[in-house]
Curated annotation (Swiss-Prot):
EC nos: 4.2.3.3
Listed GO CC annotations: cytosol
PANTHER family: METHYLGLYOXAL SYNTHASE
Keyword field: Lyase
GO biological process entries: methylglyoxal biosynthetic process
Family per similarity comment: Belongs to the methylglyoxal synthase family.
Gene Ontology MF: a single term: methylglyoxal synthase activity
List of catalytic residues: 71
Gene responsible for this protein: mgsA
Catalytic reaction annotation: dihydroxyacetone phosphate = methylglyoxal + phosphate
Sequence positions that bind substrate: 19, 23, 45-48, 65-66, 98
Organism: Pseudoalteromonas translucida (strain TAC 125)
Name this polypeptide is given: Methylglyoxal synthase
Residues forming coiled coils: none
Domain MGS-like: 6-154
Length: 154
């Protein structure tokens, strides 16, 4: 598939997600990085967003709870280029009833070329990157061009 270039703004839209067993770790990470996170627009699945807002005072756009469709809402926002970074503290040792939604979310992050942090260290590295607060370009699949050239025989 052909590629196109898209600019990401200096002020990023960051999605915050955590499985139940990792919510405390994400909360502490948000407290640790309160100042840096306040410079960006934050999105989160419902329970996680409520917890972060309540404990940090950060403004968080809260979607549905992950198992109730919040993971899919975030996936749609990634596909629509509204999310620029995903911080997802997932629990690799616990089975999740919405595992297919989680896999779809991570797949969309890979398709649309957004950085993903799955634990505190990777999230620290992304947030402290010199690219975090500057405009930057990324390559994306050129889906519109693909659709324009696609032929379907009926």
């Amino acid at each position: 598939m052909d590629q196109k270039i898209q600019s990401l703004p200096a002020k990023k839209n960051i999605a915050l997600v955590a499985h139940d067993g990792k919510k405390a770790a994400l909360k502490l990470w948000c407290i640790k990085h309160l100042n840096a996170l306040s410079e960006h627009t934050l999105y989160a699945t419902g329970t996680t967003g409520h917890l972060i807002n309540k404990t940090t005072g950060l403004d968080v756009i809260q979607l549905l709870s992950g198992p109730m469709g919040g993971d899919q809402q975030l996936g749609a926002k990634i596909a629509e280029h509204e999310i620029h970074m995903l911080v997802f503290f997932w629990d690799p040792l616990a089975s999740q009833p919405h595992d297919p939604d989680v896999k779809a979310l991570l797949r969309l992050a890979a398709v649309w070329n957004i950085p993903v942090a799955c634990n505190e260290v990777s999230a620290d590295m992304l947030l402290s990157s010199p690219l975090m607060n500057v405009e930057l370009e990324r390559t994306l699949p050129d889906y519109e061009k693909y659709l324009a050239t696609r032929q379907i025989d009926i």
